[in-house]
Swiss-Prot record:
Gene3D superfamilies: Hexapeptide repeat proteins (2.160.10.10), Spore Coat Polysaccharide Biosynthesis Protein SpsA, Chain A (3.90.550.10). This is Glucose-1-phosphate adenylyltransferase. The keyword Nucleotide-binding applies. The lineage of its organism: Bacteria, Bacillati, Bacillota, Bacilli, Bacillales. The keyword Isomerase does not apply. SUPFAM superfamilies: Nucleotide-diphospho-sugar transferases, Trimeric LpxA-like enzymes.
């Protein structure tokens, strides 16, 4: 069945800078915002944008991600024609390998795309937090008659070297592009969101696959080669909330942004919902001894202590006389009595013994605790 556009969501990233958070999980599977995983954001964006055919390309530690996505029901992607399909590295008769880069991941799954004979392919990263109407970007691509469109956002100059950076003319045509430059030419950064005319992209992927010296990456190889051949590449400016949660600090900051009433990242917008798997837990219980302020407290939580500027995932238990400040507690965390937590991320299923005090030794850092951590009565550590 022909589709005008197919979405390809790159979700195999290891996320090394997230340390313990991705030790057993792919980065897109990391919990976020009290009831979600990071991948819920691009999947929900697809649903809200009317894109009903999405391939999710997995690789590193895919088990949790596969189980979470399932047949795609939460995102209305459980369809006979299209829907969501999980795509591990592709093994052909001639052999196969792990994905060598972002472009190679798409190349290995070109037959998945070709079965829908699309005009366009939307390439997405599965590890960013944002809400975006891809349909507007598609309209921008068509209106300008582009071969490829890159969604862009202005970033602080001091962070520009972490991104693909470009210059454009007044018509938003891209004139220069550098992947993670030492000395950036601008602060206009690629968001890792691309729309390509499929016939054009396919030819470049086939050429790139034959080149042994290529890194098989969109930013390092495909985009520069298209520019060199004078194809029409245009930028699509995005002005909403977007966060690359690639470090512990940025991940924590994005969670805290949800608690800022002035933030543009709002989860209670009925016109643009973020969908996820429903855990079907009982309602939260806040006891008469509890004090909760400026926090997200989800279903199944039991709170007997103080919770301020924090996010509690489903099934979290906070004991009496305990205080939680500026922290993120993942599902089924148990906090004993007389515990103090400050700027701490507690991973799924961890139990914090009564009397424990947890905080980073540097007040600007974030402490991460997993379920295997051994405790003394008082702990302070660097992260």
């Amino acid at each position: 069945m022909k589709k005008e556009i197919v979405g390809m969501l790159l979700a195999g990233g290891e996320g090394k800078r997230l340390g313990q958070l991705t030790r057993k999980l792919a980065k897109p599977a990391v919990y976020f915002g009290g009831k979600y995983r990071i991948i819920d954001f691009p999947l929900s964006n697809c649903t809200n944008s009317g894109i009903d055919t999405v391939g999710v390309l997995t690789q590193y530690e895919p088990l949790a991600l596969n189980g979470h996505i399932g047949i795609g029901s939460p995102w209305d992607l459980d369809r006979r024609h299209g829907g969501v399909t999980v795509l591990p590295p592709y093994i052909e008769k001639q052999g196969g390998s792990w994905y060598k880069g972002t472009a190679d991941a798409i190349y290995q799954n070109r037959y998945y795309i070709e079965q829908y004979d699309p005009e366009y392919v939307l390439i997405l990263s599965g590890d960013h937090i944002y809400k975006m109407d891809y349909d507007r970007m598609i309209s921008h691509h068509k209106k300008l008659g582009a071969d490829a469109t890159i969604s862009v956002i202005e970033v602080p100059w001091e962070e520009a070297s972490r991104f693909g950076i470009m210059n454009t003319n007044e018509e938003m045509t891209i004139t220069q592009f550098e992947e993670k430059p030492t000395t950036p030419i601008s602060n206009l950064a690629s968001m890792g969101i691309y729309i390509f005319n499929w016939s054009v992209l396919k030819s470049y992927l086939i050429q790139d696959a034959k080149q042994a010296n290529s890194s098989h990456d969109f930013g390092k190889d495909i985009i520069p080669k298209m520019l060199a051949k004078d194809l029409k590449l245009v930028a699509y400016p995005f002005e909403g909330y977007w966060k690359d949660v690639g470090t512990i600090k940025s991940y924590w900051e994005a969670n805290m942004d949800l608690l800022d009433e002035h933030s543009s990242l709002m989860l209670n917008d009925p016109s643009w919902r973020i969908y996820s798997v429903n855990r079907n837990q009982p309602p939260q219980y806040i006891s008469t001894r509890a004090y909760v302020r400026c926090s997200l407290v989800n279903e199944g939580c039991v709170v007997h202590g103080n919770v301020e500027q924090s996010i509690l995932f489903p099934g979290v238990h906070i004991g009496a006389n305990s205080s939680v400040f500026e922290s993120v507690l993942m599902p089924n965390v148990k906090v004993g009595e007389n515990v103090v937590l400050r700027r701490t991320i507690i991973m799924e299923g961890a139990c914090i013994p009564s009397g424990t005090h947890l905080a980073p030794s540097d007040p600007d850092d974030i402490l991460v605790i997993d379920k295997d951590t051994e405790f003394s009565p008082s702990i302070a550590a660097n992260q």
